[in-house]
Amino acid sequence: MRCGPLYRFLWLWPYLSYVEAVPIRKVQDDTKTLIKTIVTRINDISHTQSVSSKQRVTGLDFIPGLHPLLSLSKMDQTLAIYQQILASLPSRNVIQISNDLENLRDLLHLLAASKSCPLPQVRALESLESLGVVLEASLYSTEVVALSRLQGSLQDMLRQLDLSPGC
């Protein structure tokens, strides 16, 4: 009888079965750290300080504003909108921020999975179809307003993560 491979497998089994899951607290801390990093990157772009995140600009109503209570799915949806907006901007300032938003969304998906609430896939939003026209008319304003509102939304998310948001 050829039991060599079986014995090797049984000998390795304790090592193979010992898989340590990433503690959810670590994921939450990483999420908060990444949010703070993105806010710092936005602060480093000097022209974003000139607009309040609460200010309304005609034609830019599709850019999400502040939300007092955010669930994980609402956070993901909001970040997806900002990611689409930033990806359409030609500015080199927003490339890293857009990449950070993708990573942040991945961390939110991990947090949601830990609570057994998978987040639905976010598809392209209809409100962003007019983005091309708005960008042609006011590229600079769109960038400033989007980054300013993103910064406010991220700060709301940071506060909400301390309260352990629901699905």
UniProtKB/Swiss-Prot annotation:
Gene3D superfamilies: 1.20.1250.10
Chief localization: secreted
InterPro entries (alphabetical): 4_helix_cytokine-like_core (IPR009079), Leptin (IPR000065)
SS bond list: C117-C167
Keywords of the record: Disulfide bond, Obesity, Secreted, Signal
Subcellular location: Secreted
SUPFAM superfamilies per the UniProt record, alphabetical: 4-helical cytokines
Position of the signal peptide: 1-21
A cellular component term, taken from the record's GO annotations: extracellular space
GO biological process: activation of protein kinase C activity; bone growth; cellular response to leptin stimulus; energy reserve metabolic process; intestinal absorption; leptin-mediated signaling pathway; lipid metabolic process; negative regulation of appetite by leptin-mediated signaling pathway
Top-rank taxon: Eukaryota
GO molecular function, one term: hormone activity
Family of this protein: Belongs to the leptin family.
Protein's job: Key player in the regulation of energy balance and body weight control. Once released into the circulation, has central and peripheral effects by binding LEPR, found in many tissues, which results in the activation of several major signaling pathways. In the hypothalamus, acts as an appetite-regulating factor that induces a decrease in food intake and an increase in energy consumption by inducing anorexinogenic factors and suppressing orexigenic neuropeptides, also regulates bone mass and secretion of hypothalamo-pituitary-adrenal hormones.
Protein name: Leptin
UniProt source species: Capra hircus (Goat)
UniProt lineage: Eukaryota, Metazoa, Chordata, Craniata, Vertebrata
Underlying gene: LEP
